[in-house]
Amino acid sequence: MTILAWCIAWVLDFIIGDPQHWPHPVRWIGRLITFVQRIVRRYCPGDKALRIGGGVMWVVVVGATWGVAWGVLALAQRIHPWFGWSVEVWMIFTTLAGRSLARAAQEVERPLRENDLAESRIKLSWIVGRDTSQLQPAQINRGVVETVAENTVDGIIAPLFFLFLGGAPLAMAYKAVNTLDSMVGYKHEKYRAIGMVSARMDDVANYLPARLSWLLLGIAAGLCRLSGWRALRIGWRDRYNHSSPNCAWSEACVAGALGIQLGGPNNYFGERVDKPWIGDAQRDISVDDISRTIRLMWVASTLALALFIAARCGLSGVA
């Protein structure tokens, strides 16, 4: 039944994703982070106090998320096993973001194909932290490909990894870790102190999933009739060409599969950031690379699901 729940949740994400205006745990986690952050900032003046307060915030948010998820699931199972199973499917479904990621990428791709540069810049600004107001088509394409490649890890592979390790409650706790990093894990002045623990713990949580993504995306590249060997080679060569210890693993693998370059200089919060280049520019990046990257994401996520199901069956002896 557990494996069936995994499969149904994955299929639901593939088909419908997160319908707009539906209640979603990540939104609740975000509200909790905002509430706790306000308290921490009020009572923790100075960088040292903010770092400690940020650590307490991380423990409170992640612990509360795991505890509530475990409690809701346990209560639902006591009401009725089938109700508990349905709640488990729903929880797992909410931790996966493949369809939402694909839709967000396609929202940028569509105006690009129609030569509506202004609209594509606006849509890209919804999914990246960089300044998009002056970006040209090649830079927009690169931003979308990087976003899909990076979020293949924290939107699909990592939730499945923690689902395998500790069930739906641990997958929900991972989403709290990831949401904390998304909201406060920045290096600029406002969040550097309060978000330090959140940023570092997100790096820890994604350490193994990011490295697993290198292998899965390399295999996916071969299955998609791209260069799987080049994906693995470039992915390994450029795996540390990023300020994050994890992001370049998936980005470099995708760059290698497509034969393009990612990374490079961008503006974040009014500051120019010169990132290392990732991959080799064997050709110019194009709008078609967005759909190719989405395809790689889906194949890699399918492989991840199959891998964790096989591992679960091997450990439990239950097919």
UniProtKB/Swiss-Prot annotation:
Transmembrane helix in keyword set: yes
Pathway: Cofactor biosynthesis; adenosylcobalamin biosynthesis
A single Gene Ontology CC term: plasma membrane
Location of this chain's protein in the cell: Cell membrane
Matches recorded under Pfam families: CobD_Cbib
Record bears the keyword NADP: no
GO molecular function, one term: ABC-type vitamin B12 transporter activity
UniProt topology in membrane: Multi-pass membrane protein
InterPro entries reported for this sequence: Cobalamin_biosynth_CobD/CbiB (IPR004485)
Main localisation: membrane
A biological process from GO: cobalamin biosynthetic process
Keywords, sorted A to Z: Cell membrane, Cobalamin biosynthesis, Membrane, Transmembrane, Transmembrane helix
Membrane spanning residue stretches: 56-76, 82-102, 153-173, 204-224, 296-316
Family: Belongs to the CobD/CbiB family.
Its biological purpose: Converts cobyric acid to cobinamide by the addition of aminopropanol on the F carboxylic group. However, the true cosubstrate could be (R)-1-amino-2-propanol O-2-phosphate, leading to cobinamide phosphate.
Protein name according to UniProt: Cobalamin biosynthesis protein CbiB
Organism: Salmonella paratyphi B (strain ATCC BAA-1250 / SPB7)
